[in-house]
UniProtKB/Swiss-Prot annotation:
GO terms for cellular component: cytosolic large ribosomal subunit. Residues 119-147 are annotated as: Disordered. Pfam families: Ribosomal_L3. One of its GO terms (biological process) is translation. Keywords: Ribonucleoprotein, Ribosomal protein, RNA-binding, rRNA-binding. Belongs to the universal ribosomal protein uL3 family. It comes from the Bacteria. The gene is rplC. This is Large ribosomal subunit protein uL3. GO terms for molecular function: rRNA binding; structural constituent of ribosome.
């Protein structure tokens, strides 16, 4: 069954494994999440667990948010996300989900919001090649042809525009270390998002089994 937790991306560092191998890891701080709601097929049409992360000041919370938090006997939360495919009997409204949910060696999917890069051209945004810089060339970094047949720009045409700030999921990352007393997960490799951004860690659904 799926397990999940919400956390904050702290940054990257390096650790040594038991075999003495240096591994780059991303540090994710996941303070205890509160189960805000348990959704069932009978009441909501699907099964899911709603987790809340990071307290939100009362002055910034409206009445519906306060009422929803009161049902879980907690304060309003800044981030609320749903985790599907879980074992509902393992969760109760108001209970906490901690990093102990995972263990070293677990394979997970990590979802975050990619870093924003503002308005960018084709070369940086899509990785296209530039034209010649000299010898009379008039084609340097411009997008190029829009198409030669239809009298409009086709859908999906790669053009300059806003880059980043997209929901990105990286699959099949390995948890190298769990530091329960500091509410920290160390995940091998990099994860999407800027420092201090929200990260959702869930059990990988398409994990590749290791050969015995």
């Amino acid at each position: 069954m799926t397990k999940g937790i919400l956390g904050r991306k702290v940054g990257m560092t390096q650790i040594f494994t038991k075999d003495g191998i240096l591994v780059p890891v991303t540090v994710v701080e996941a303070t205890p999440n509160v189960v805000m709601q348990v959704k069932t097929v009978e009441s909501d049409g699907y099964e899911a667990v709603q987790l809340g992360y990071q307290d939100k000041r009362e002055v910034l919370s409206n009445k519906p948010e306060k009422g929803h938090a009161d049902k879980a006997k907690t304060s309003p939360k800044r981030f609320i996300r749903e985790i599907r495919g879980v074992e509902l009997k393992d969760y109760e409204v108001g209970s906490e989900v901690t990093v102990d949910t995972f263990k070293e060696g677990d394979v997970v999917n990590v979802t975050g919001t990619s870093r924003g890069h503002g308005y960018q051209g084709n070369i940086k945004r899509w990785g296209q090649s530039r034209g010649p810089e000299t010898h009379g060339s008039r084609y340097h970094r411009i997008p190029g042809s829009m198409g030669s047949i239809i009298n409009r720009v086709p859908k999906g045409k790669r053009l300059p525009g806003h880059m980043g700030v997209k929901k990105v999921t990286i699959e099949n990352l390995v948890i190298e270390k769990v530091v329960a007393d500091k509410n920290v997960l160390m995940i091998k490799g990099n994860v999407p998002g800027a420092k201090n951004s929200l990260i959702v860690v869930k059990t990988a659904s398409k994990a590749v089994k290791a050969d015995k």
